[in-house]
């Protein structure tokens, strides 16, 4: 009786689950059947769609497509390439009569026709039968076949590394383009973690060295790539994390006077999995990166943003205080909330740090310094920080100048597409803080529009008003965009990168693109996810979901009115002098308009007022004038003769009348002083090591300057661990040559005794040699974890169960450990027909069941850092699923209730055959 009751509950749940999922942006199933119709959203089991291509275009990121038994002919390249999507996976082997409940490819034969042979095996693994009868479109000698073959060949180049390909006659190799060159393409299979998809991207310039980096979100972590040589990108390291479709990344950099060096941290959020906020230490670049912590202020968040910073240098804007916003998190209903970066290696909540109602999907900020700060922000300071809240069905403007007294300023909406087809996704503000560009992620897919970017005037912060829009030539979805000068750089999904001229913000003009997704330009979730146009070099970073990292060169900046630029990337200044900074109007072929540009000084290691006099202003060129313009900066006098070399920055912005920003839009001003040789410190402050580990390597880094030779000495000292009894005595000197910034290491030998004892610690302390300087971590604590009292981890597996032949099977283990030691995992097959395990070194693995019935036995082993392990086995019985027949037809009206009864009885029988897990 209990079993039958449970079955009735399951049947009831079938009719409720889809309504529940309808409130979620992702993680829904879409259904396809031979007898379906290509209407609606394909998310109702009783109303499946007919074609795979249509269903994919209704899906959101993270959804999956379930295909019922039948024959499906692939007649377009669109469907062909959607079958390879990692973001919206497609599975065959389902049955519409059991409501797509169980995958059974051997029973529910799902045939695909017109599939190239090299795509056959992966699709078989997804539950499809491939009809290889020699009649594929790819075997025909027709124009259509040749076009498909060319598209397929172009698609395969997406998995190949490419460098230095100029855009000529609308193409850069296999990539369609206009005014954008390919400097380098780093495909997903070049990343060390071997991810199957990528997501968002951000950039970083290390102000200690000038090196440039890409930080790209991957399905399984965040990779940091050195792009200083843009034609030879090199991965520095990857910080691994849980698998997820969604990651977002931002960087904050600050100058640490105690070590006279710039310090930088990256903050990565995750959605779709509970992996907290990943804080990454970027201070060992270019040698390595490391995890600081998984900060638990939230379990997950869709996006992250840092306000009051310059997005090229990732440093604080003059006179402002940076704060970090977590967006779309599991707290506060998804409303954004702010955190202090006073201690950048962690997150500290700010008072009253969440507000309003609704879910913030993404955010940006602007700083108002004109009369609106008093008349509309009611702020009496130098500026008003306005947070732009992209809130699903509207954009909201908030005054976050004082995060403890945040107020709503205004709300903007639009009505050119039905509310049900809207999703206010993201956007950015113009450099003059007068307009916002807004992206809607659903208006193409659900509203039937071509790519559409809406422009809002915020001249009245209390009443944001749409004043224009850009409509693209394709239906590709516009995703994320950023303003640099009078260009708008936008990830445009299947169209790749799109660049708009926003000289007239209300009427943008398409001036360039680079198509990172070669098969199509449909409103699907393939192609370019993110873009970052702020590197000092001017190179553009693009992340593509299926093909990885692109480094691009912008050729949209050529203008008859010229390019405005500093004469070099840096200049030198002496203490106490007034320097002249020159700005050029270059390459002006028809300078018939007056132009202007703004300049602003940004503090670095040199501080405004104490080291230089702050300045900001506008430079003007009359029509037909191409002479250099200049402004002066006063450098303060060093009264102590003890100041080290310092620097600050000058940036150009807001070029007018179609002039553009040139190669050098940022200038570093280096003030002379004493030469610094950098500082030496341990990379981390502590570690725990197993007593039976043997030799322990401990890394040290030279941070800041690498000028001159430096040395440090080190010495071990006892705490609860005794030198000579628990660890061998050691001391020595470590040297760095002039120009050497490589990481060094020292070794200590742990003594493994046979006593049962508590954890014990000892210290390694650094000392300067001949005037060298120490950094932050001058003492390193080593905790020895006793292996004699160690207990093995405890492994729990799911119960033995039945699976259908040909089905995709997921197996999951849980592990606990009394000592909370780091773990490694391994799934292995010990009996049965051979299978291939995916993610065999993770807690959750998967495989495709064989086509023959029988038992499959798997073993899972968890091993702790001290070498103790535990294993458990799991037996899965592979069975041929029963054939599910359609319910009896309804003969007439009077027999309708009887048919429903038969149908319910039929569903009870089907579901009761399944083993409850």
Could you describe each region identified by the protein language model?
Residues 61-89, 93-98:
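N-terminal extracellular ligand-recognition/capping segment immediately after the signal peptide
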């Amino acid at each position: 009786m209990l079993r039958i009751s449970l079955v009735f509950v399951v049947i009831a749940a079938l009719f409720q689950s889809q309504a529940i999922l309808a409130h979620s942006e992702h993680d829904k199933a879409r259904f396809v059947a031979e007898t379906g119709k290509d209407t609606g959203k394909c998310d109702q089991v009783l109303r499946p769609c007919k074609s795979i291509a249509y269903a994919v275009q209704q899906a959101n990121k993270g959804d999956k497509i379930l295909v019922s038994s039948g024959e499906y002919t692939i007649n377009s390249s669109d469907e062909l390439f959607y079958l390879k999507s990692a973001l919206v996976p497609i599975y065959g082997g389902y049955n519409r009569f059991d409501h797509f409940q169980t995958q059974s490819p051997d029973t529910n034969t799902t045939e695909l026709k017109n599939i190239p042979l090299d795509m056959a095996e992966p699709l078989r693994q997804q539950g499809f039968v491939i009809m290889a009868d020699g009649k594929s479109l790819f075997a025909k000698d027709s124009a259509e076949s040749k076009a498909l073959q060319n598209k397929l060949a172009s698609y395969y180049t997406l998995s190949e590394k490419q460098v230095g390909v100029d855009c000529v006659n609308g193409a850069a190799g296999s990539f369609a383009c206009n005014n954008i060159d390919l400097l380098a393409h780093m495909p997903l299979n070049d990343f060390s973690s071997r991810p199957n998809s990528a997501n968002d991207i951000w950039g970083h310039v290390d102000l200690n060295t000038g090196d440039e980096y890409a930080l790209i979100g991957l399905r399984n972590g965040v990779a940091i790539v050195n792009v200083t040589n843009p034609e030879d990108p090199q991965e520095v390291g990857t910080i691994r994390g849980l698998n997820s479709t969604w990651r977002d990344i931002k960087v904050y950099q600050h100058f640490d006077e105690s070590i006279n060096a710039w310090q930088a941290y990256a903050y990565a959020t995750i959605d779709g999995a509970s992996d907290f906020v990943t804080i990454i230490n970027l201070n060992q670049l270019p040698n390595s990166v490391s995890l600081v912590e998984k900060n638990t202020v939230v379990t997950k968040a869709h996006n992250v943003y840092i306000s009051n910073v310059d997005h090229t240098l990732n440093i604080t804007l003059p006179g402002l205080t940076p704060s970090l916003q977590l967006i779309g998190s599991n707290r506060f209903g998804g409303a954004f909330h702010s955190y202090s970066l006073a201690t950048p290696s962690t997150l500290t909540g700010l008072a009253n740090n969440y507000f309003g109602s609704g879910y913030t999907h993404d955010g940006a900020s602007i700083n108002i310094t004109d009369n609106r700060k008093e008349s509309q922000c009611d702020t009496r300071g130098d500026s008003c920080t306005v947070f732009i809240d992209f809130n699903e069905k509207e954009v909201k403007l908030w005054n976050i100048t004082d995060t403890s007294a945040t107020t709503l300023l205004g709300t903007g909406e639009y009505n050119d597409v039905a509310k049900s087809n809207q999703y206010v996704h993201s956007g950015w503000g113009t450099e003059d803080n007068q307009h916002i560009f807004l992206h809607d992620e659903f208006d193409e897919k659900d509203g039937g529009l071509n790519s559409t970017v809406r422009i809002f005037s915020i001249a009245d912060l209390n009443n944001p008003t749409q004043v224009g829009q850009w409509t693209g030539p394709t239906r590709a979805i516009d995703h994320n965009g950023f303003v640099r000068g009078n260009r708008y750089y936008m990830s445009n999904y299947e169209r790749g990168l799109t660049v708009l001229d926003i000289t007239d913000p209300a009427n943008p003009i398409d001036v360039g693109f680079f198509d990172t997704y070669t098969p199509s330009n449909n409103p699907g979730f393939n192609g370019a996810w993110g873009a970052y146009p702020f590197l000092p070099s001017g190179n553009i970073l693009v992340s593509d979901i299926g093909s990885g990292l692109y480094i691009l060169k912008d050729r949209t900046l050529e203008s008859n009115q010229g390019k405005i630029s500093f004469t070099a990337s840096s200049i030198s200044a002496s203490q106490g002098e007034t320097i002249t900074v020159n700005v050029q109007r270059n390459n002006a072929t028809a300078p018939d308009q007056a132009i202007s540009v703004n300049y602003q000084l940004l503090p670095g290691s040199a501080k405004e007022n104490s080291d230089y006099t702050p300045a900001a202003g506008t430079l003007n060129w009359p029509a037909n004038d191409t002479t250099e313009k200049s402004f002066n900066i006063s450098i303060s006098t060093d009264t102590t003769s003890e100041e080290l070399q310092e620097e600050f920055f000058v940036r150009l912005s807001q070029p007018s009348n179609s002039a553009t920003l040139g190669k050098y839009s940022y200038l570093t001003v280096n003030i002379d002083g004493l030469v610094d040789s950098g500082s030496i410190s341990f990379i981390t402050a502590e570690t725990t090591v197993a007593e039976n580990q043997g030799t322990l390597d401990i890394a040290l880094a030279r941070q800041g300057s690498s000028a001159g030779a430096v040395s440090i000495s080190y010495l071990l000292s006892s705490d609860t661990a005794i030198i000579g009894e628990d660890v061998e005595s050691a001391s020595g000197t470590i040297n760095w040559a002039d120009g050497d910034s490589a990481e060094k290491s020292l070794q200590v030998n742990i003594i493994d005794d046979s006593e049962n004892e508590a954890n014990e610690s000892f210290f390694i302390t650094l000392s300067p040699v001949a005037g060298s300087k120490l950094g932050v971590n001058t003492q390193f604590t080593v905790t020895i974890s006793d292996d004699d009292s160690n207990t093995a981890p405890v492994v729990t597996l799911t119960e033995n169960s039945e699976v259908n032949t040909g089905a995709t099977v997921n197996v999951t283990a849980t592990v606990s450990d009394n000592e909370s030691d780091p773990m490694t995992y391994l799934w292995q097959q010990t009996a049965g027909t051979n299978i291939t395990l995916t993610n065999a070194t993770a807690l959750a693995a998967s495989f495709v069941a064989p086509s023959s019935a029988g038992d499959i036995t798997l073993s899972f082993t968890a091993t702790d850092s001290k070498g103790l392990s535990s294993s458990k086995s799991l037996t899965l019985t592979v069975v041929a699923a029963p054939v599910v027949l359609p319910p009896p037809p309804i003969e007439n009206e009077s027999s309708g209730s009887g048919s429903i009864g038969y149908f319910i009885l039929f569903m009870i029988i089907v579901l009761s055959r399944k083993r409850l897990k």
